[in-house]
Each structure stands twice: as structure tokens, then as C-alpha cells.
């Protein structure tokens, strides 16, 4: 199996959000891949939608119903436990991708030998394949064989998790994987990585998305994600070497983003 795509799902049935995501995945131009959708105890009919796709695409589509709500990190971990692919990709269940999204990233990986490949993305407020506001997820100078300077740059601005594919060992050899029961788990997580400077991922902005729904719990989770980042820097013995960058990233995540969330 070349690729496993993991989709954490929680209450995305309304307005065809989940359908748009899944349709974009089952229509990918790569052939050797699987889709692992993890329902995180949805209270709408998201699980029923997932079961329909599993029925219609039995050789490609697998549904896991989580016994408890573990947030996106826990759902990702459940999916990873079932993943067979040499490469791992993640997608938010309210977003969608171009039909050749994974083909182009895998092609880039084969040509360069990179452990991780990413791309740019669109910001959009409606379901469409039209070009929206293009966001450059990372800088070209951050790519290639990762030096200390590139690591410093990536700590300060690592970009989004979901617009990348990862060599299996990068994720599965990571002892803590994703923290569970909190939002913003992306902040808690190669030797080389490459960037395809083309927007292939559609990031859907709406009122119920994780980063646009502000609650006390989510602000507390953001702060906990910052603490996790520091704990893991200590665990892997790179806190001292990259202290200024980690301190800056912690301050942004723990204080600045949380403050602006409360003010929004």
C-alpha cells in the first residue's frame, strides 16, 4: 500500500461539508491508496454518511467508530493504528483537495527522495473548485536537507499538517504521536522535505471550524498544546539548542493566539 489518508470526523454532515471532502478523496488519480475515516462520536449523521462510502468503496474505504470523543489527535491515532501505507496523509473533514493532490505530492517525493512533501492551499468560504485566496504554506528556503537553520525556521513557522504527506516512519516512529482529548494537536508535532509550490488543498473557512469556534475549552486546549510542545522539546533534548525559537513559538501559541481568540 503506497498511501493511507486519515480523516478525523466530528459533526460535519451539515451543508455537504463531509460529502465534499470524501468525494474529493475517492476520486484521487493515484491507484494504490486507502481512506481511513475515524468518526469521533459525532452526534449528527456523519457516521451514517461514512458507512455509505464504506459500502460503495469497500476496497478503499475503512470506517472506525471511536468509542469516545478523543478530539482530532485521538482520532488520528486510531487511524494510524490501522494505516498500511508507506506514506501517510491527513485531511480535515470539512476541507477538500484537487483530484491529483496526492499524485503530485507522491511524484515530488519519488523525484527528490524527501521524507515529507507539502504544497500551498486555497482559503475559501464556499464549496467550489475555483481558485480562491492562495496561501503559501511554507517557504522554499525551508526545504531540502534540513540544517539547523532550517529547523529553526520551521519551529517558528512550520505550516499546516494537512497539506503534507509523511513517510510512514516519521509519524509511526514518533513515540507520542498526537496528544488526545485536546484541540490544536498539530502544534505538538525528517531529515528532508520538499515543497510543491502549487495550491492543491482547499481550506474551508466557516463558523464551526476548529480555528474559528472560540470556547473556553478550546483556548485552554491551545495553551495545553503549547505546554506539550515544550515538554517534548525537553524529552528529545533540543530545547536548549533551539530555545529562542521554541520560546517564540510557545509565546505565540500560549499567549498571543489565545488572547486574540478571546478578543475576537
How should each PLM-predicted stretch be described?
Residues 148-216, 221:
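Conserved nucleotide-sugar donor-binding catalytic segment
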Residues 88:
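Short aromatic/hydrophobic "clamp" motif used to bind/position activated sugar donors
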Residues 12-27:
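Short, well-formed alpha-helical segments that are part of the catalytic scaffolds
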Residues 31, 39-48, 68:
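A conserved acidic beta->alpha catalytic loop
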Residues 100-133:
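Conserved donor NDP-sugar-binding/catalytic core segment of glycosyltransferases
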Residues 2-6, 34, 188:
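Cell-envelope/extracellular polymer assembly enzymes that use nucleotide-activated donors
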Residues 66-83:
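Glycine-rich, basic loop-to-helix element that forms the pyrophosphate-binding segment
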